[in-house]
Design a protein with these regions (language model features):
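Membrane-proximal N-terminal amphipathic helix
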Residues: 39-66
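N-terminal leader/signal peptides at the extreme start of proteins
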Residues: 1-11
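Alpha-helical hydrophobic helix detector
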Residues: 16-33
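Conserved G/P- and acidic residue-centered "switch" motifs that form tight phosphate/ATP-binding loops
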Residues: 10-15, 32, 53
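Periplasmic/extracellular, small/polar-rich flexible segments of pilin-like filament-forming proteins
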Residues: 62-145
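Residue-level signal for short amphipathic helical patches enriched in basic/charged
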Residues: 8, 26-29, 41-44
Length: 145
């Protein structure tokens, strides 16, 4: 009996290289999307901190008819100037002694959120949030607010 030898078939080097190229492209796209999502998720930590400051300021204003200065130990008693997850710190500046304030949440230097295109987030006594949606240079990786 004569057995026929079959030619063993496999993948060619060119086919393997094409598959690896497709995997590399998909990995690059997925990584960029993941980074954008991560920045947006961590940005919520700073937004939450600013909203807590704004609420504390309004409570303080309702009682004393002026806005507070110190978010930690003094007027507002928030307990910490750092956000819950530690990505942002808050600073309050007052342009008028009693009538208005601006609270700014700045990313902590050295952590991954410091590279976010939105940078520092802020809210003032009128409720204006910055960076604004129309600021296209800051909103490149998702809406800042």
């Amino acid at each position: 009996m004569i057995s026929k030898l079959r030619r063993t078939r496999g993948f060619t080097l060119l086919e393997l290289m094409i598959v690896l190229l497709v995997i590399a492209i998909l990995t690059t796209i997925a990584t960029q999307q993941y980074l954008r999502y991560s920045y947006r998720a961590r940005r919520a930590d700073g937004q939450e901190l600013l909203m807590r400051v704004a609420n504390a300021q309004e409570r303080y204003y309702a009682t004393f008819n002026k806005y507070g200065d110190d978010p930690v130990t003094g007027d507002l008693k928030l307990g910490s100037a750092t956000s819950e997850k530690g990505y942002y710190t808050v600073k309050i500046t007052k342009t008028d002694l009693t009538k208005d304030y601006t609270a700014t949440a700045t990313p902590v230097a050295g952590n991954s959120q410091a590279k976010d295109a939105c940078g520092a987030l802020s809210i003032n006594s009128a409720g204006v949030k910055l960076p604004a949606l129309t600021d296209t240079t800051k909103n490149t990786n998702g809406r800042c607010w």
